[in-house]
Amino acid sequence: MKNICVWSVFGLLTVGSAVQAQTTNTTDKSPAPTTMPKTADKEARRGELLATFGGCHDCHTPKVMTPKGPQPDTSRLLSGYPSNASLPAVPQGVIGPTQWGALASNDLTAWAGPWGISFAANLTPDVTGLGHWTAQDFIHTMRTGKHLGMGRALLPPMPWFDSAVLTDQDLKALFKYLRSLKPISNQVPQPIPPQATAAH
């Protein structure tokens, strides 16, 4: 009798496992990732995942318009606001305490708000981007929210306060990924202060 119970339990577990595996295989229709990390170096690959998950491409990569909406322009990864782009005018009376909080350019690389107009930085290793930066410069900037850790404040929508909680190891991995990108010459303009926003 004891053997029958043991074999019955074993049989039920086996059948249950098979049903579970079959159910999982047939009902799990999660889409496969559309892009897999391409960076060969393990630390840089981790940085690439952090950049992707952290939304760096949302603002720092110019977009191309597709039937599904704006998509990252993979030929200009993380190169920031295109220096040859024409900046649309900011409508008067649209941004304010009882109005909209911010407006974005069509490719989401320029933002207007109470702070003025900010432009997504070039994060590639070109001299017009992070070419002269060290890992320590990058870490200090991400920790303080100030350009090179002592310059002007990083403006919205840059969520530096979220990046500030990353470990030094994570920030070094992110910087290593940025250094692995194709250098793109693109001198991003300086921010435009609120009082000059009306002229644009």
What do these predicted ranges mean?
Residues 7-16:
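Bacterial N-terminal signal peptides
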Residues 42, 63, 153, 170, ...:
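Ligand-binding pocket scaffold of soluble enzyme catalytic domains
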Residues 65-140, 154-167, 197-200:
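Gly/Gly-Pro-rich "capping" loops immediately C-terminal to redox-active cysteine motifs
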Residues 19-23:
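Boundary at the C-terminal end of the N-terminal hydrophobic targeting segment
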Residues 47, 53-63, 138, 174, ...:
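The canonical Cys-X-X-Cys-His
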Residues 27-52, 64-70, 89-90, 132:
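Electrostatic cytochrome c docking/interface patches
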Residues 132-147, 160-189:
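C-terminal capping alpha-helices of c-type cytochrome domains
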Residues 1-4:
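Positively charged n-region of N-terminal signal peptides that target proteins for export
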